[in-house]
Amino acid sequence: MPRLWIKICGMRTPEAIESAAQSGADAVGFVFHADSPRNVSAEEARALRSAVPESLERVAVFLHPSQALLDAAIDALAPHWVQADSTDLASLRLPQGQRVLPVLRSGGPRPDPLPSRCLFESGRSGAGEVADWDEARRIATGTEVVLAGGLDAHNVGDAVRAVRPFGVDVSSGVESSRGVKDVARIREFIRAARAAEPFPVREEIRR
């Protein structure tokens, strides 16, 4: 049976990173977008990088970045994954071999063919809006979907059972206030997500 991939996004403190690691997350995300309450600079990301244990993958998260911002963030964080809208990724220069996590949105366009893995969320990143689970499940029949958008400890189990995603991603759903991660909510979210496992392997993406 597959193990659900869990990403906690919007890391800004070593304490939140430690909570994610100790609670069994697989990845942590760092947001590089000035309009987000979870924004970190390249310098802040470089300092936080030392707090990320080897058990966690680092994800650099962007929304319409400049090439200069992308380059600085990658240099600082050395991310395992770069997450950005698929249209942004098409116009950016990435280091050779850099793995990407294209973002698809509810009601938005879909690339053809689908990427081997993508993040699916609502129309606005980090707004706590629930994505269209029916649309997500349809996409998940053909590729590995990381489901995001409005998830928290109360609905993630239902989301996993409804969509059968490769993984889940949470940010505002584990915060006590905008941009402030709550270590207890991180634990509760991961516990609830793991409780929804296992679910059958989809034939379409079995390796």
Over which residues does each language-model region extend?
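Conserved N-terminal beta1-alpha1 strand-loop-helix module at the mouth
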Residues: 1-120, 125-207
